[in-house]
Regions:
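Conserved donor-nucleotide binding/catalytic region of nucleotide-linked donor-dependent transferases
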Residues: 252-274
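Conserved acidic donor-binding segment of nucleotide-sugar-dependent glycosyltransferases
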Residues: 244-250
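Short, hydrophobic alpha-helical segments
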Residues: 261-262, 284-286
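Nucleotide-sugar donor-binding catalytic core of glycosyltransferases
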Residues: 4-214, 221, 225, 229-239, ...
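Residues at or immediately preceding the N-termini of alpha-helices
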Residues: 190, 250-253
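Solvent-exposed, flexible loop/coil residues
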Residues: 215, 243-244
Protein backbone atom coordinates (compact mmCIF):
# COMPACT_ATOMS: atom_id res chain seq x y z
CA UNK A 1 0.00 0.00 0.00
CA UNK A 2 1.34 3.41 -0.93
CA UNK A 3 1.37 6.38 1.38
CA UNK A 4 -1.25 8.05 -0.84
CA UNK A 5 -3.94 5.55 0.21
CA UNK A 6 -3.91 6.77 3.83
CA UNK A 7 -5.81 9.62 5.51
CA UNK A 8 -4.12 12.95 6.24
CA UNK A 9 -3.49 12.08 9.95
CA UNK A 10 -2.05 8.71 8.90
CA UNK A 11 0.23 10.38 6.35
CA UNK A 12 1.43 12.79 9.04
CA UNK A 13 2.25 9.84 11.31
CA UNK A 14 4.16 8.18 8.48
CA UNK A 15 6.16 11.37 7.93
CA UNK A 16 7.04 11.50 11.63
CA UNK A 17 8.21 7.89 11.47
CA UNK A 18 10.33 8.69 8.44
CA UNK A 19 12.06 11.47 10.36
CA UNK A 20 12.52 9.24 13.40
CA UNK A 21 13.86 6.23 11.49
CA UNK A 22 15.97 8.08 8.93
CA UNK A 23 19.16 6.02 8.46
CA UNK A 24 17.80 3.29 10.79
CA UNK A 25 17.39 -0.42 10.02
CA UNK A 26 15.04 -3.05 11.42
CA UNK A 27 17.74 -5.54 12.52
CA UNK A 28 17.57 -8.48 13.09
CA UNK A 29 14.77 -8.51 10.49
CA UNK A 30 15.96 -8.56 6.88
CA UNK A 31 15.57 -5.51 4.67
CA UNK A 32 17.45 -3.96 1.78
CA UNK A 33 18.99 -1.31 4.04
CA UNK A 34 19.80 -3.93 6.66
CA UNK A 35 21.73 -6.04 4.16
CA UNK A 36 23.50 -2.93 2.87
CA UNK A 37 24.59 -2.10 6.43
CA UNK A 38 26.75 -5.23 6.71
CA UNK A 39 28.69 -4.54 3.50
CA UNK A 40 32.04 -2.77 3.13
CA UNK A 41 30.75 -0.34 0.51
CA UNK A 42 27.29 0.79 -0.60
CA UNK A 43 26.45 2.06 -4.10
CA UNK A 44 23.05 3.77 -3.97
CA UNK A 45 23.32 6.25 -6.82
CA UNK A 46 25.34 7.31 -9.84
CA UNK A 47 27.84 9.38 -7.83
CA UNK A 48 28.55 6.39 -5.56
CA UNK A 49 29.14 4.31 -8.67
CA UNK A 50 31.56 6.85 -10.10
CA UNK A 51 33.46 7.11 -6.81
CA UNK A 52 33.74 3.32 -6.65
CA UNK A 53 35.08 3.19 -10.21
CA UNK A 54 37.70 5.89 -9.53
CA UNK A 55 38.99 5.03 -6.09
CA UNK A 56 37.89 1.76 -4.51
CA UNK A 57 40.17 -1.23 -4.83
CA UNK A 58 39.84 -2.73 -1.35
CA UNK A 59 36.18 -3.36 -0.53
CA UNK A 60 35.47 -7.09 -0.39
CA UNK A 61 31.68 -7.04 -0.02
CA UNK A 62 29.91 -4.43 -2.14
CA UNK A 63 26.20 -3.57 -2.01
CA UNK A 64 24.81 -2.03 -5.18
CA UNK A 65 21.31 -0.88 -6.01
CA UNK A 66 20.12 -3.55 -8.42
CA UNK A 67 19.27 -1.31 -11.37
CA UNK A 68 22.84 0.08 -11.29
CA UNK A 69 24.49 -3.36 -11.43
CA UNK A 70 24.75 -3.56 -15.26
CA UNK A 71 26.86 -0.38 -15.19
CA UNK A 72 29.47 -2.16 -13.05
CA UNK A 73 30.44 -4.17 -16.14
CA UNK A 74 31.96 -1.00 -17.63
CA UNK A 75 34.53 -0.70 -14.83
CA UNK A 76 38.12 -1.93 -15.26
CA UNK A 77 38.74 -4.25 -12.31
CA UNK A 78 42.46 -4.83 -12.86
CA UNK A 79 44.18 -6.04 -9.64
CA UNK A 80 40.94 -5.87 -7.66
CA UNK A 81 40.39 -8.16 -4.64
CA UNK A 82 38.09 -11.19 -4.65
CA UNK A 83 34.75 -9.48 -4.27
CA UNK A 84 31.17 -10.42 -3.44
CA UNK A 85 28.34 -8.35 -4.91
CA UNK A 86 25.12 -7.86 -2.97
CA UNK A 87 22.34 -6.37 -5.14
CA UNK A 88 19.02 -5.04 -3.88
CA UNK A 89 16.83 -2.06 -2.92
CA UNK A 90 15.20 -2.03 -6.35
CA UNK A 91 12.39 -3.74 -8.29
CA UNK A 92 14.92 -4.69 -10.98
CA UNK A 93 14.73 -8.37 -12.05
CA UNK A 94 17.86 -10.31 -12.98
CA UNK A 95 16.88 -12.48 -15.94
CA UNK A 96 20.17 -12.94 -17.82
CA UNK A 97 23.74 -13.65 -16.74
CA UNK A 98 24.93 -10.79 -18.95
CA UNK A 99 23.39 -8.33 -16.48
CA UNK A 100 26.07 -8.95 -13.84
CA UNK A 101 29.81 -7.98 -13.85
CA UNK A 102 31.55 -11.37 -13.92
CA UNK A 103 35.02 -9.83 -14.35
CA UNK A 104 34.89 -7.78 -11.17
CA UNK A 105 33.22 -10.18 -8.74
CA UNK A 106 33.53 -13.87 -7.95
CA UNK A 107 30.17 -14.36 -6.21
CA UNK A 108 26.76 -12.72 -6.34
CA UNK A 109 23.75 -12.49 -4.02
CA UNK A 110 20.91 -10.94 -6.00
CA UNK A 111 17.39 -9.90 -5.10
CA UNK A 112 14.74 -10.71 -7.74
CA UNK A 113 17.01 -13.27 -9.38
CA UNK A 114 16.02 -15.70 -12.13
CA UNK A 115 19.66 -16.63 -12.83
CA UNK A 116 20.83 -18.18 -9.55
CA UNK A 117 22.87 -21.37 -9.89
CA UNK A 118 23.66 -22.14 -6.23
CA UNK A 119 27.35 -22.11 -7.15
CA UNK A 120 28.41 -18.49 -7.35
CA UNK A 121 25.05 -16.79 -7.96
CA UNK A 122 22.47 -16.94 -5.17
CA UNK A 123 19.05 -15.44 -4.59
CA UNK A 124 18.88 -12.83 -1.85
CA UNK A 125 15.64 -12.02 0.02
CA UNK A 126 14.26 -8.51 -0.35
CA UNK A 127 12.95 -8.91 3.19
CA UNK A 128 10.60 -6.35 4.67
CA UNK A 129 10.11 -2.76 3.62
CA UNK A 130 12.93 -0.46 4.75
CA UNK A 131 12.22 1.01 8.19
CA UNK A 132 12.98 4.51 6.89
CA UNK A 133 9.84 4.41 4.70
CA UNK A 134 7.77 4.38 7.88
CA UNK A 135 4.86 2.16 6.79
CA UNK A 136 5.09 -1.63 6.66
CA UNK A 137 8.59 -2.29 7.98
CA UNK A 138 7.89 -1.64 11.67
CA UNK A 139 9.26 -4.52 13.81
CA UNK A 140 6.38 -4.22 16.31
CA UNK A 141 3.99 -5.24 13.53
CA UNK A 142 5.96 -8.35 12.58
CA UNK A 143 5.16 -10.47 15.61
CA UNK A 144 3.38 -13.83 15.65
CA UNK A 145 0.18 -13.19 17.61
CA UNK A 146 -1.84 -16.34 16.80
CA UNK A 147 -0.76 -19.97 16.90
CA UNK A 148 -0.97 -22.07 13.74
CA UNK A 149 -4.04 -24.11 14.66
CA UNK A 150 -6.19 -21.07 15.49
CA UNK A 151 -5.77 -19.50 12.05
CA UNK A 152 -8.08 -19.64 9.06
CA UNK A 153 -7.19 -22.18 6.38
CA UNK A 154 -8.32 -19.81 3.64
CA UNK A 155 -5.75 -17.94 1.58
CA UNK A 156 -5.54 -14.23 2.39
CA UNK A 157 -5.60 -12.11 -0.79
CA UNK A 158 -4.80 -8.40 -0.77
CA UNK A 159 -5.02 -5.61 -0.23
CA UNK A 160 -2.49 -4.59 -2.85
CA UNK A 161 -2.04 -2.17 -5.73
CA UNK A 162 -2.40 -3.40 -9.36
CA UNK A 163 1.31 -3.28 -10.19
CA UNK A 164 1.31 -6.51 -12.26
CA UNK A 165 -1.20 -8.52 -14.28
CA UNK A 166 -0.59 -11.52 -12.00
CA UNK A 167 -2.42 -9.65 -9.24
CA UNK A 168 -5.45 -9.11 -11.46
CA UNK A 169 -5.44 -12.80 -12.38
CA UNK A 170 -5.32 -13.76 -8.70
CA UNK A 171 -8.29 -11.53 -7.85
CA UNK A 172 -10.32 -13.03 -10.69
CA UNK A 173 -9.70 -16.56 -9.37
CA UNK A 174 -10.27 -15.52 -5.74
CA UNK A 175 -13.63 -13.98 -6.59
CA UNK A 176 -14.76 -17.34 -8.00
CA UNK A 177 -13.11 -19.67 -5.47
CA UNK A 178 -14.53 -18.20 -2.26
CA UNK A 179 -14.11 -21.47 -0.33
CA UNK A 180 -10.34 -21.24 -0.87
CA UNK A 181 -9.59 -17.51 -0.87
CA UNK A 182 -10.54 -14.53 1.29
CA UNK A 183 -10.18 -11.13 -0.35
CA UNK A 184 -9.21 -8.37 2.08
CA UNK A 185 -10.00 -4.86 0.93
CA UNK A 186 -8.09 -1.77 1.98
CA UNK A 187 -6.72 0.58 2.79
CA UNK A 188 -5.67 -0.80 6.18
CA UNK A 189 -3.32 0.75 8.70
CA UNK A 190 -0.01 -1.14 9.09
CA UNK A 191 -1.16 -2.39 12.50
CA UNK A 192 -4.54 -3.57 11.23
CA UNK A 193 -2.91 -5.24 8.23
CA UNK A 194 -0.55 -7.13 10.56
CA UNK A 195 -3.46 -8.26 12.72
CA UNK A 196 -5.35 -9.44 9.64
CA UNK A 197 -2.42 -11.46 8.31
CA UNK A 198 -1.93 -13.16 11.67
CA UNK A 199 -5.39 -14.65 11.24
CA UNK A 200 -4.43 -16.74 8.19
CA UNK A 201 -2.22 -19.77 7.64
CA UNK A 202 -1.66 -19.00 3.97
CA UNK A 203 -0.93 -15.70 2.22
CA UNK A 204 -1.09 -15.15 -1.55
CA UNK A 205 2.03 -13.28 -2.66
CA UNK A 206 1.62 -12.37 -6.35
CA UNK A 207 4.50 -10.54 -7.92
CA UNK A 208 4.50 -6.77 -8.25
CA UNK A 209 7.02 -4.58 -10.07
CA UNK A 210 9.66 -7.16 -9.07
CA UNK A 211 9.23 -10.93 -8.72
CA UNK A 212 9.93 -10.84 -4.96
CA UNK A 213 7.55 -9.01 -2.63
CA UNK A 214 7.76 -7.67 0.91
CA UNK A 215 4.50 -9.53 1.58
CA UNK A 216 6.28 -12.87 1.10
CA UNK A 217 8.70 -12.09 3.93
CA UNK A 218 6.09 -10.38 6.13
CA UNK A 219 4.06 -13.59 5.93
CA UNK A 220 7.01 -15.68 7.11
CA UNK A 221 7.81 -13.33 10.00
CA UNK A 222 4.18 -13.54 11.15
CA UNK A 223 4.19 -17.34 11.07
CA UNK A 224 2.18 -17.72 7.86
CA UNK A 225 3.08 -19.60 4.67
CA UNK A 226 3.44 -17.59 1.44
CA UNK A 227 1.99 -18.94 -1.81
CA UNK A 228 3.59 -17.92 -5.11
CA UNK A 229 3.44 -18.82 -8.77
CA UNK A 230 6.31 -21.24 -9.43
CA UNK A 231 9.30 -19.69 -11.20
CA UNK A 232 13.08 -19.91 -11.38
CA UNK A 233 13.09 -17.32 -8.61
CA UNK A 234 10.91 -19.34 -6.21
CA UNK A 235 12.87 -22.51 -6.99
CA UNK A 236 16.11 -20.71 -6.13
CA UNK A 237 14.89 -20.06 -2.57
CA UNK A 238 15.12 -23.73 -1.61
CA UNK A 239 18.62 -23.36 -0.16
CA UNK A 240 17.14 -21.07 2.50
CA UNK A 241 14.95 -23.87 3.95
CA UNK A 242 11.77 -21.80 4.20
CA UNK A 243 8.13 -22.92 4.25
CA UNK A 244 6.41 -21.86 1.02
CA UNK A 245 3.95 -23.20 -1.51
CA UNK A 246 4.51 -22.98 -5.27
CA UNK A 247 1.60 -23.36 -7.71
CA UNK A 248 1.45 -23.32 -11.50
CA UNK A 249 -1.61 -21.09 -11.35
CA UNK A 250 -3.82 -19.66 -8.61
CA UNK A 251 -6.61 -22.19 -9.24
CA UNK A 252 -4.25 -24.88 -7.89
CA UNK A 253 -4.01 -23.25 -4.45
CA UNK A 254 -6.77 -25.33 -2.85
CA UNK A 255 -5.16 -28.68 -3.68
CA UNK A 256 -1.69 -27.37 -2.78
CA UNK A 257 -2.93 -26.33 0.66
CA UNK A 258 -4.41 -29.78 1.29
CA UNK A 259 -1.05 -31.38 0.48
CA UNK A 260 0.77 -28.92 2.73
CA UNK A 261 -1.56 -29.41 5.70
CA UNK A 262 -1.02 -33.18 5.55
CA UNK A 263 2.53 -32.47 6.70
CA UNK A 264 3.72 -31.17 10.07
CA UNK A 265 3.07 -27.49 10.89
CA UNK A 266 5.80 -25.13 9.60
CA UNK A 267 8.65 -24.10 11.85
CA UNK A 268 8.08 -20.83 13.74
CA UNK A 269 9.97 -17.78 12.44
CA UNK A 270 12.47 -17.94 15.31
CA UNK A 271 13.69 -21.31 13.97
CA UNK A 272 14.09 -20.14 10.36
CA UNK A 273 17.71 -19.02 10.44
CA UNK A 274 17.75 -17.43 6.99
CA UNK A 275 15.09 -14.89 8.06
CA UNK A 276 17.55 -13.09 10.31
CA UNK A 277 20.45 -10.74 9.63
CA UNK A 278 23.02 -12.69 11.74
CA UNK A 279 22.64 -15.64 9.33
CA UNK A 280 23.70 -13.42 6.43
CA UNK A 281 26.58 -11.88 8.34
CA UNK A 282 27.97 -15.35 8.92
CA UNK A 283 27.26 -16.56 5.38
CA UNK A 284 28.99 -13.56 3.81
CA UNK A 285 31.82 -13.45 6.33
CA UNK A 286 31.02 -9.92 7.49
Amino acid sequence: MSKGTFSIPARLLIRLRQLRYHNSISSPFLSGDGLASICDLVINNQSDLEAFARHDRNSRIVFCRSDLVPELSRIDFVSSPRRTLIAGNSDYDFTASSQIPHDGFESFHLQNSFISNDENIFTLPIGIENLSIGINGLPNNLKVTKDWNSRSTKVMVGPFSPTHTERKELLEVAEQETKVFKIIKGPLSPKRFAQEMNGYKFIACPRGNGIDTHRFWEALYRGSVPIVIASKWSNSLKYLDLPLIEVSNWAEAGNAIKEFTDQSPPKPPSELKSLWLPFWKELLGC
